[in-house]
Amino acid sequence: MTEENQTVISQFLLLGLPIPSEHQHVFYALFLSMYLTTVLGNLIIIILIHLDSHLHTPMYLFLSNLSFSDLCFSSVTMPKLLQNMQSQVPSIPFAGCLTQLYFYLYFADLESFLLVAMAYDRYVAICFPLHYMSIMSPKLCVSLVVLSWVLTTFHAMLHTLLMARLSFCADNMIPHFFCDISPLLKLSCSDTHVNELVIFVMGGLVIVIPFVLIIVSYARVVASILKVPSVRGIHKIFSTCGSHLSVVSLFYGTIIGLYLCPSANNSTVKETVMAMMYTVVTPMLNPFIYSLRNRDMKEALIRVLCKKKITFCL
């Protein structure tokens, strides 16, 4: 074995985004504003749902968990990206890289499972309105949330442990803005066939199957409403399914295209842009799409503000 191959990598260099140096400050301000918008929007949702008893329903239980997941998902990558954009040496320790990978996978998987739970909730609400409260009991809702958190732990840990067993020799430059699976596998000088097989198999379980379940749920919603077509029914389809499906398509579409159907023609820049879509853009848009345009959330915000105002005056 050569001396080069015996070198142990203690840190990686995150090359970040291919942004010209003269535009760094502009993009730094843009990404900082996007991150702050994500944090503020999701925090507002979590706080409102906690404070307003009218929002203590299955739908908003899932939504509060989704908002927390979005907040954490974005926080796994964005602070490090912002730090590296201001640093001369954008490095990350090997242990820090594995930690970032674990939490990135954890919250990505959690979002996937929570989106399924939300789709099922809407399916029951529209197709079985008279039995909604009996089907979506508090016990079932809490069980779905807890199951989502537990399943993601095992999946994220599996990929992280498989990555930790690999050897990294001379090259330590990651052409990405965070420690993602694909660029790390390309840097490894070990056999990565097991990792790639697990990505394909487990990806089908935590990405493809949830995506199919969401599509099936909404297909049955549409079929149920079309049996008795009406303007109100069609409006319900668009108001209930449209926003959710747009985010689902953005989230799952980029992940499936990036990890499960990779193209040999995919450039590093293209992969980075796709990663930005679901790590930065989607968590930022979710509060606006799911809640801040929602009448219940607006009314809850008014009630909370009025209550605080009265308390302050007293």
Curated annotation (Swiss-Prot):
TM ranges: 26-49, 58-79, 101-120, 140-158, 197-219, 237-260, 273-292
Residues in compartment: Cytoplasmic: 50-57, 121-139, 220-236, 293-314
Record-level GO cellular component terms: plasma membrane
GO biological process, one term: signal transduction
Entries under PROSITE patterns matching the protein: G_PROTEIN_RECEP_F1_1, G_PROTEIN_RECEP_F1_2
Disulphide connectivity of cysteines: C97-C189
Pfam family, one: 7tm_4
Main location, first listed in the record: membrane
Tissue: Olfactory epithelium.
Signal peptide residue numbers: none
CDD domains attached to this UniProt entry: 7tmA_OR1_7-like (cd15918)
Location in the cell: Cell membrane
Topology of this chain in the membrane: Multi-pass membrane protein
Extracellular side: 1-25, 80-100, 159-196, 261-272
SUPFAM superfamilies assigned to the protein according to its UniProt record, in alphabetical order: Family A G protein-coupled receptor-like
Family to which this protein belongs: Belongs to the G-protein coupled receptor 1 family.
Its biological purpose: Odorant receptor.
Name of this chain's protein: Olfactory receptor 1468
Organism in which the protein naturally occurs: Rattus norvegicus
